From Swiss-Prot:
It is found in: Nucleus. Belongs to the TFS-II family. TFA subfamily. Its main location: nucleus. This is Transcription elongation factor A protein-like 3. It comes from Mus musculus. Pfam families: BEX.
Length: 200
């Protein structure tokens, strides 16, 4: 609650109506500003005085407490808004004049992300270019990663040929022992048994 009060006080200072400090020139203005707020609040009742009176009379005659509850709710809502009249802005006061308190429907809050999108067409074009450039960079990085992975695979296949220069390693295709199954390079149709090899 303290944070809300701090925000309201900040708004009042911005509007030129601080609660504690009032300059002599501002006293007349603040009195004039408060008078329209007081006049604005009875306006919803002035719009429908007969309609509000009828449900109360019918509710008492017929004994329906639901309609009495609604009228009490209206009184509470308007009574609650009186202490905060200084904190209300002019637009809120106008909105209160247009519709009664029971028809209050909260508005949809605007998303913060939507506010920054309509800056200017130049900014949007720059954003598109930045996105395009970043996608190109991503493609380059992916290509570099695939190259590095391929080189790593080749080195792993080559195994222990550290004495051979790298240029020669790329040309060599590693071949494992031909006669043993389950080893790299071995296997396939050309595999022979130990008895088929002429010299052991």
């Amino acid at each position: 609650m303290e944070e809300v009060r701090g925000e309201n006080e900040g708004k009042l200072e911005k509007e030129g109506k601080p609660e504690d400090e009032v300059e002599p020139e501002d006293e007349e203005k603040s009195d004039e500003d408060e008078k329209p707020d007081k006049k604005a609040k009875p306006a919803p009742r002035q719009g429908k005085p007969e309609e509000e009176a009828k449900p109360d009379e019918q509710g008492q005659d017929e004994g329906k407490p639901e309609k009495q509850g609604k009228s009490d709710g209206e009184g509470k809502r308007q009574g609650e808004s009186k202490p905060d009249s200084q904190a209300k802005s002019a637009s809120e006061a106008r909105a209160a004049e247009k519709r009664p308190a029971e028809d209050y429907v909260p508005r949809k809050a605007k998303r913060k992300t939507d506010r920054g999108t309509d800056d200017s067409p130049k900014n949007s074009q720059e954003d598109l270019q930045d996105r395009h450039v970043s996608s190109e960079e991503m493609m380059r990085e992916c290509a570099d990663m695939t190259r590095a992975q391929e080189e790593l695979r080749k080195r792993q296949k080559m195994g222990g040929f550290h004495w051979v220069p790298r240029d020669a390693q790329d040309a060599l295709v590693p071949r494992g022992p031909r006669g043993v199954r389950g080893v790299r390079g071995g296997g396939g149709r050309s595999q022979r048994g130990l008895h088929d090899i002429p010299y052991l």
